[in-house]
């Protein structure tokens, strides 16, 4: 009799994806983040489902329903903070996952990479809408400022914004639809993840050397399941430390004040994981230009496979490209810091320089350096 995991039509798919999947024998801990992201998504859907049972998406009661969850629901505060800080862990894993792809040349699997970029946009949209739901000051003003950016689109902008708002300002209709979409999108993301994995399993995983590893593969289970569980424990340790010791560390104190359309907070800013894009948006003193730069800061990932000029896939043996990669990382951290600062000297000029450097490294310096390294190989 054949083993059921190899013959059953449903279990067979799981077996070929997570158990008998041939994986390169030398992939490092940087390959852990895919599974961690899957776990983050599951955690967010689960905690979100229980939160949705107690939340009301009405401007009059949204803020107090969140307070009710934290005070009166059994372990409601754990659910709320797991969900809020789980989003932060999600983005940490996402950015490290993308960074790994950039460093080791995984972007040359174009279908998988482009699917990943679509996933990144979907997760960002979901997180933005989720931030609006507690209906605090930063929720309301963040929603107003970010949705208002669409009015920069020529001709249809104003109509588009009012259509999204469901009125002439961010109000009850906006909150209700944001809740509906925030609930729906994670399930769409789950479907997109399946497609992402489908594309990945067509080609197989990349590895740190960037050299094809078809002749040296090992089964995913038990080797990488154990390795992934270690990564999972480390992530849970960080997440629980955040939730149980300083749950509000990554949040904004202004969001503990109920939304008031008549009082603007002194400094409107999004959650920390959007600050780098927000800094790029603010660095251009033109509304449409800023919006374009904001979208391009993420969309630029799509053209990266076409900017690959090196003869080697990975950066493992390319010291000059490595320096540029870490310069880009430092630049993104600088942008994240600037995004949280007020719009005044010297932050404005630092933000502008960091924004220019960001696009310059990706579009110009990196491809030229790769060409130079190709010539150095001939010596």
UniProtKB/Swiss-Prot annotation:
- Report keywords, A-Z: Electron transport, Heme, Iron, Membrane, Metal-binding, Mitochondrion, Mitochondrion inner membrane, Respiratory chain, Transmembrane, Transmembrane helix, Transport, Ubiquinone
Localization, UniProt: Mitochondrion inner membrane
Query: Which Gene Ontology terms of cellular component type are present?
Result: mitochondrial inner membrane; respiratory chain complex III
Residue sites binding heme b b562 per the record: 83, 182
Q: Which InterPro entries match?
A: Cyt_b/b6_C, Cyt_b/b6_C_sf, Cyt_b/b6_N, Cytb/b6-like_sf, Cytochrome_b, Cytochrome_b_C_euk/bac, Cytochrome_b_N_euk/bac, Di-haem_cyt_TM
A molecular function (GO) held by this record is:
ubiquinol-cytochrome-c reductase activity
* Co-factor binding details: Binds 2 heme b groups non-covalently.
> Which residues does heme b b566 bind?
97, 196
**Where is this chain primarily localised?**
mitochondrion
What else is on record for this protein?
Heme 1 (or BL or b562) is low-potential and absorbs at about 562 nm, and heme 2 (or BH or b566) is high-potential and absorbs at about 566 nm.
Function per UniProt: Component of the ubiquinol-cytochrome c reductase complex (complex III or cytochrome b-c1 complex) that is part of the mitochondrial respiratory chain. The b-c1 complex mediates electron transfer from ubiquinol to cytochrome c. Contributes to the generation of a proton gradient across the mitochondrial membrane that is then used for ATP synthesis.
Which family does this protein fall into? Answer: Belongs to the cytochrome b family.
Protein name per the record: Cytochrome b
Q: Which organism is it from?
A: Pipistrellus pipistrellus (Common pipistrelle)
